[in-house]
Amino acid sequence: ISAPLEHDAVDWLECGKSATVAPILPANDPILKALALPATMAITNAEAEGTERQLERLEEALAGGLRLVQVRDRGWPPAQRLWFAETVVRLAHERGALVVVNGDADIARRTGADGLHLPAAALAACRERPDFTWVGASCHTAAEIARAGELALDYALVGPVLPTPTHPDNPGIGWTGFAAATAGNMLPVFALGGMRRDMLATAQAHGAHGIALMRGW
């Protein structure tokens, strides 16, 4: 029978910070991680924008409160991508921001990144959760989102929701399609594709945890 717990200690924690109270039941771990997951993810696009300008914008965004970055730029030679990822991790960690590296566990480990982001093909081939603090995946279908949940990943990127220059022939699934694809799923989901910073409330109204942007962050 439940009863009031008088005189128990209460501690107010800042949203986005990890809880320090222990012990905590394991079932609460995904909830606490979701609370610590920022609502806006910036995805790097230095291949198109240029390294210098991209890093300048990143510093500005981090100073303005950005706290989650995905290093993409998969077309670069390994050495160039390693250097860029190291620079992003350094800048982000100076501001207390998280960094995940797209598709390359070796670079993620060597740079001290916080996690790994799996492209959809890597998600399909994955048999167990990679050994990183933060692991997410790109998903395009409800089945892929479900698979990410089965692997106990921390988040999924779902899209494209709206038309985007990255996929000019794809009109996007729209907000209705996004809501349908993510319905009933407990995994934190970011809306991807054609996003702007002022769309966060719209995304959350359709069931998203947040938004992911390659442009406009």
Name these PLM-found stretches:
Residues 99-114, 140-154, 183-191, 195-213:
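Catalytic cores of alpha/beta
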Residues 119-128, 157-169, 197-217:
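Glycine-rich phosphate-binding active-site loops on the catalytic face of alpha/beta enzymes
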Residues 37-55, 134-139, 191:
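Active-site mouth loops of central-metabolism enzymes
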Residues 70-80, 160-167:
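Glycine-rich, proline-tolerant flexible connector loops at the mouths of alpha/beta enzymes
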Residues 4-47:
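Nudix hydrolase/Nudix homology domain
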Residues 81-103, 120-123, 128-141, 169-197:
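Alpha-helix-loop-beta-strand connector modules within alpha/beta enzyme cores
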Residues 43-47, 74, 104, 121, ...:
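Active-site beta-loop-alpha junctions enriched in small/polar residues
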Residues 58-64, 90, 94, 109, ...:
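Acidic (Asp/Glu)-rich catalytic clusters
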